[in-house]
Regions:
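Glycine-rich beta-alpha junction loops
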Residues: 31, 45-51, 200, 222, ...
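Conserved N-terminal alpha-helix of the aminotransferase class I/II PLP-enzyme fold
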Residues: 53-102, 127-134
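Conserved C-terminal alpha-helix-loop-beta "cap" of PLP-dependent enzymes
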Residues: 297-383, 387
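Short, acidic Gly/Pro/Ser/Thr-rich loop/turn segments
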Residues: 34, 50-54, 242-243, 330-333, ...
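N-terminal "arm"/small-domain region of PLP-dependent enzymes with the aminotransferase-like
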Residues: 2-75, 83
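Conserved PLP-enzyme active-site core in the AAT-like
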Residues: 2-19, 26-35, 93-294, 299
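Acidic-histidine catalytic/liganding microenvironments
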Residues: 88, 289-293, 341
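PLP-dependent enzyme catalytic core of the Aspartate aminotransferase-like
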Residues: 1-11, 133-134, 142-144, 160-163, ...
Length: 406
């Protein structure tokens, strides 16, 4: 009869997915049906939850029985997203955050203390550098930077108080790589952890935990969403470390909203399909750009000219969607190139179905001192294109407008 509900058969829950493939996990992992038997992922908009009795409330707050307490702690929609990410990354547990930067903040603040030492790759996102240099150092955490690809440099820089190694691979925006498995061995041999920002690849192209990393962080704002709609982040790893991260997030509060979690669940359903299309377009554009006058250098691991092309082939399932290149004319040339485009969006975001273009040295890395940008390899002539899903010939035509303006 219409309007009546029935108990859902627990034996038919989609959470029984042992042994299935990546695409199946991306569509069905983490789904928990309510008694309504809905087929889609439900959104739970609530700040708090009702307890049956005072004793029930006390038991839940004490962690003696499972159940939701408060949406700063847990939310069913957010939990579904966390479980799906954990399944895709091969993690024991994942926890969602309000932004990608909140994910990095949570990892360092929960696992490091004053007097601990952290090693960071030089080629990381500008805001990540600011977070480590301007804030973590203020709390007594020592920070040093190491060239990403130089394994011997990492080994030599580890101190007795080194708590973690933090890397982006591929890096933003130069697409530099590190051998994750080899770096994990170095870290573990000296009793420290390896944290990998997997934003550029997503688990569709790379699963750092399966290569030996301890924790993975993401800006879900990028490719996990895939359409530039909302912001979020996620941390995934072993339950031992994740317990500390969860505790920090529940106390500090940079948690993900259920609406954004629902958007990310929808994004994950098409993640693998989208990443294949992104990679195909990016490969075509990188090869085309490498042949053009006015282009001094193209940074894309899918090119045979890239010094880490073989590592990318071995470590990743695709070369990613971000193509960076250096043009003649320095900053003025880069700005003329960008301003001449008509189809591509001038915006600092990436991972969108719409192709975006930006000038890193005056946007994402603009707050860094000139010497910091130089150390990170961010030159004034550098342009970053996050390749979307448009017809590649239209993208080539738009970039040709930029070339004509040089």
């Amino acid at each position: 009869m219409g309007g009546m509900t029935q108990e859902w058969d627990a034996g038919r829950l989609d959470s029984d997915l042992e042994g299935v493939g990546f695409d199946t996990l991306a569509v069905r992992a983490g789904q928990h049906r309510t008694p309504e038997g809905e087929h889609g992922d439900p959104m739970f908009f609530t700040s708090s939850y009702v307890f049956r009795t005072a004793a029930d409330a006390a038991a839940r707050f004490a962690g003696e029985v499972p159940g939701n307490v408060y949406s700063r702690y847990t939310n069913p929609t957010v939990r579904s997203f966390e479980e799906r990410i954990a399944a895709l990354e091969g993690a024991e547990q994942a926890v969602a955050t309000a932004t990608g930067m909140a994910a990095t903040l949570a990892v360092v603040m929960s696992l490091c203390s004053a007097g601990d030492h952290v090693l960071v790759s030089r080629s990381v996102f500008g805001s990540t550098i600011s977070l480590f240099d301007k804030y973590f150092k203020r709390f007594g955490i020592e920070v040093d930077y190491v060239p990403l690809a130089e394994l011997s440099g990492w080994d030599a820089a580890i101190k007795p108080n080194t708590k973690m190694l933090f890397v982006e691979s591929p890096s933003n925006p130069l697409a530099e790589l590190v051998d994750i498995a080899a770096l994990a061995e170095i870290a573990h041999a000296k009793g420290t952890m390896l944290i990998v920002d997997n934003c550029f690849c997503t688990p569709a192209l790379q699963q750092p935990l399966l290569l030996g990393a301890d924790i993975v962080v993401h800006s879900a704002t990028k490719f996990i969403d895939g359409q530039g709609r909302c912001m979020g982040g996620v941390v995934a790893g072993r339950s031992e470390q994740m317990k500390e991260v969860v505790g920090f997030l529940r106390t500090a509060g940079p948690t993900l909203s259920p609406f954004n979690a629902w958007i990310f669940l929808k994004g994950l359903e098409t993640l693998n399909l989208r990443m294949r299309a992104h990679c195909a377009n990016a490969q075509a554009l990188a090869q085309w750009l490498e042949q053009q006058d006015g282009i001094e250098k193209v940074h894309y691991a899918g090119l045979k000219s890239h010094p880490q092309h073989e590592l990318a082939q071995r470590q990743q399932k695709g070369f990613g969607a971000v193509v960076s290149f250096e043009v003649k004319g320095g900053k003025d040339g880069a700005w003329r190139f960008i301003d001449a485009t008509r189809l591509i969006s001038i915006t600092a975001n990436l991972g969108d179905s719409k192709t975006t273009i930006t000038h890193p040295s005056t946007t994402s890395h603009g707050r860094l001192a000139p010497q910091e940008r130089e150390a990170a390899g961010i030159r004034d002539s550098l342009i970053r294109v996050a390749v979307g899903l448009e017809d590649v010939t239209d993208l080539q035509a738009d970039l040709a407008r930029g070339l004509a303006a040089l």
